[in-house]
């Protein structure tokens, strides 16, 4: 029996909410979604904690979600892996090489990383452990703090800076620059933002304050929250030297690449660069925790069958449907086509909650109509990226936009005889306000996410499961045997 072509729609940040007043998905106008969940087979998937390879209770994120969906197994994520290994980092050969190089040249260490306990891109405890180790070798550490305010509350930096100051009080370390992640962790080629952070770190240019707390107070007094703090030089810091070493403490790669790339390109004299992980196959820097290869992902299985597949997303989420979905592989598989639609050029996405969803759908529908792809994977970024702004009305518009796009995809799938699957990578827009703290909620959630099958052959029902069960379910619909590497399970029951 030949299987069906499948269109897999991943709705970023679209969790199962409570239906309360701050649930943007429930509050938005979503006629297609309402019909789909009432008429099509539907179940719920766990997208956080140990079910996606994270520590218990840790919220999911886009990287982890796409890895789990695309690989069909629970992959031990960097956060949990580093948690297990960080106390032995003083023995890590790459760290020892890094230290020896600095000692031989008489330089200092520049440590760059996101300062929070959000656990999405970094963990402050990792940074603090490494600072203690490096200063223990007699090396001065300049810390280039990136403020979060996105995976944690928007005005929480005082807590994290206070914790860091307490940690380094008796160590040969100091905060050299402070910048919001809006500048230091852009991933949408807004190089003007990246350049402001780079100039502060490399050349000590930009606004200057006497201390990190003073800089934060000035920012708050100007109405600017953590994420958007303008890169600021602290104290007497005067920039990098060729004899120095640079260590990035973020373990997730997508929001490191622009700043790292700028450093490698514009300051090639600094050759001693170390990362928590291998951020890119093209940027060959040493890593404390090298990647572990993942074989027989969904994309690889489709390719091995000689079938064509398509990945499509806008800039903000393109890496997720390609690199992460393929288990950390940068190059496309044979037969894998990729389409990237530019994200809109706005400072924050609540200014354009539609983002590029309509343009994605225009291109996607054309490809579905061609019937050349056995598997099509699309990401709609709206609920997540607009959810991160904390703007409820904008989030509702974002959700409504995605709903209208899903309707177009559904009609195209039906006309092409394809099965349409709808799921999400993690929650976000279903919780837009934190009642306890009386402030907008901008972070991810630990909500379950939906899993809906539209236009399937025959009478089927779905079991609840985990994100890692999506790939086996796709293979089941395509009538392709599931490889033993995939430990997830098809969620389909065929009712005869």
Curated annotation (Swiss-Prot):
Domain of life from the UniProt record? Bacteria
This protein's pathway: Carbohydrate degradation; glycolysis; pyruvate from D-glyceraldehyde 3-phosphate: step 3/5
Q: How is the cofactor bound?
A: Binds 2 manganese ions per subunit.
Q: Where does Mn(2+) 2 bind?
A: 12, 62, 425-426
Q: Which GO terms describe its molecular function?
A: manganese ion binding; phosphoglycerate mutase activity
The record's EC number reads 5.4.2.12
Instruction: Identify which top EC class this enzyme belongs to.
Output: isomerase
Please report the name of this protein according to its UniProt entry: 2,3-bisphosphoglycerate-independent phosphoglycerate mutase
Provide the species name. Anaplasma phagocytophilum (strain HZ)
